């Protein structure tokens, strides 16, 4: 008869959780950032708010975003006028759109990851779905399971309302699932559609400027990864190993990044203090996770950072003395896609591996061995994942 310890050991993988494939997707509607202020103020009949519009133009110009992908087209907004009216009850209309579209966008990203993985979807044992877009029972994880045709026995975990740190949280959960369930293959899907947080300009030129910041930054996208330990090297291609993952709260900072769900949708509040608060607290997190590896030079690692906004990236770079190229992948994703909340950091991970493979830099982490995946969001919550790159043959 087997002992409890023998049973526990047999259930666990031997090696670390590994990223085996990545897929991303966006809505077809691409919006030029320079044209967005005119669109937002016209569609919400706010063109008469000239001073507020100039402030919003300045926000968009300073966002370092070239374009974004948004599900909300002019046609959809015209068919849902309450969404375009400041603080008008519109939650039902927003929810109806989000519930229908989030699983579909997630499916597209998941299919790309499964195709890259080149294995049968029947081998997926776990599903982690993360979104701030909608809430329903059964959830988006259930809908995606049906859309993909996954096994009815797939073990699902649904994560709602995580915000921008959700991608890191989903990876941390997937790491635990893969390493504690021998042979597990975990599909992680993060989907964000800004239908819930789209907001018309306020009636006052000075009120709720922090809400407008979100309108200048947030965008729609879905990302998916497949995670598993002990990859079968003949048929699976490892990209990154997840060596260590942790989450922490910055004390007394819950007001810095937050959002309120109301009858008028999800109202985001992003205070101007966020870049300073984040940059002042990141180094102690780095020391904590990299001390066992003897690493204290932050330019010696590769960076997969959530691109919350240019001011945040600039402050992190300044505080840690990072070389400009260290945050290249994050800045590229911000420029080409905007801030896609939980889905965003996995776009950066994808850009990291694509860029380094194209340049033939030796490893999936810009030729370096060790790296950091870093996410932050409401709480203020910080997710840190230590990555180990894989050699490029």
Curated annotation (Swiss-Prot):
Pathway: Secondary metabolite biosynthesis; flavonoid biosynthesis. Expressed in seedlings after illumination with UV light. No expression detectable in flowers. It is not known for sure whether CHSG encodes a chalcone synthase or a very closely related condensing enzyme. The active site is at 164. GO terms for biological process: flavonoid biosynthetic process; polyketide biosynthetic process. SUPFAM superfamilies: Thiolase-like (SSF53901). The keyword ATP-binding does not apply. InterPro entries: Chalcone/stilbene_synt_C (IPR012328), Chalcone/stilbene_synt_N (IPR001099), Chalcone/stilbene_synthase_AS (IPR018088), Polyketide_synthase_type-III (IPR011141), Thiolase-like (IPR016039). Its EC number is 2.3.1.74. It comes from the Eukaryota. It is an enzyme of class 2 (transferase). One of its GO terms (molecular function) is naringenin-chalcone synthase activity. It catalyses: (E)-4-coumaroyl-CoA + 3 malonyl-CoA + 3 H(+) = 2',4,4',6'-tetrahydroxychalcone + 3 CO2 + 4 CoA. Keywords: Acyltransferase, Flavonoid biosynthesis, Transferase. The primary product of this enzyme is 4,2',4',6'-tetrahydroxychalcone (also termed naringenin-chalcone or chalcone) which can under specific conditions spontaneously isomerize into naringenin. Belongs to the thiolase-like superfamily. Chalcone/stilbene synthases family. PANTHER family: CHALCONE SYNTHASE, HYDROXYMETHYLGLUTARYL-COA SYNTHASE. This is Chalcone synthase G. It comes from Petunia hybrida.
């Amino acid at each position: 008869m087997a002992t409890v310890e023998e049973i526990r050991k047999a259930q666990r993988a031997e090696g670390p959780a590994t990223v085996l494939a990545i897929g991303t997707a966006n809505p077809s509607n691409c919006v030029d950032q320079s044209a967005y202020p005119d669109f937002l103020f016209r569609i919400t009949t706010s063109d008469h708010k000239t001073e507020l519009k100039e402030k919003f133009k300045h926000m968009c110009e300073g966002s370092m975003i070239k374009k974004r992908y948004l599900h909300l087209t002019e046609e959809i907004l015209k068919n849902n006028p309450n969404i375009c009216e400041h603080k008008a009850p519109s939650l039902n209309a927003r929810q109806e759109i989000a519930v229908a579209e989030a699983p579909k966008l997630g499916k597209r990203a998941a299919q790309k990851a499964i195709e890259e993985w080149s294995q049968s979807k029947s081998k997926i044992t776990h599903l982690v779905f993360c979104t701030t877009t909608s809430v329903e029972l059964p959830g988006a994880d259930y809908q995606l399971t049906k859309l993909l045709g996954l096994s009815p026995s797939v073990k699902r975990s649904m994560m709602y309302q995580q915000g921008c740190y959700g991608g890191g949280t989903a990876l941390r959960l997937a790491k635990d699932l893969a390493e504690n369930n021998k042979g597990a293959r975990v599909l992680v899907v993060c989907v964000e559609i800004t239908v819930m947080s789209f907001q018309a300009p306020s009636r006052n030129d000075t009120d709720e400027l922090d809400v407008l910041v979100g309108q200048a930054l947030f965008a729609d996208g879905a990302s998916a990864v497949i995670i598993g330990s002990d990859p079968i090297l003949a048929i699976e291609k490892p990209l990154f190993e997840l060596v260590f993952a942790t989450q922490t709260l910055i004390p007394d900072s819950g007001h810095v990044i937050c959002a309120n769900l109301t009858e008028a949708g999800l109202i985001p509040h992003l205070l101007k203090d966020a870049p300073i608060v984040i940059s002042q607290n990141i180094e102690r997190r780095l020391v904590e996770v990299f001390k066992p590896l003897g690493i204290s030079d932050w330019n010696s690692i590769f960076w997969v950072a959530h691109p919350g906004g240019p001011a945040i990236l600039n402050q992190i770079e300044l505080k840690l003395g990072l070389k400009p190229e260290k945050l290249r992948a994050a800045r590229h994703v911000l420029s080409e896609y905007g801030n896609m909340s939980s889905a965003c950091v996995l776009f950066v991970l994808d850009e990291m591996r694509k860029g380094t493979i194209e340049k033939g830099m030796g490893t999936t982490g810009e030729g370096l061995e060790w790296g950091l995946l870093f996410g932050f969001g409401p709480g203020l919550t910080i997710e840190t994942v230590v990555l180990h790159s894989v050699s490029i043959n």
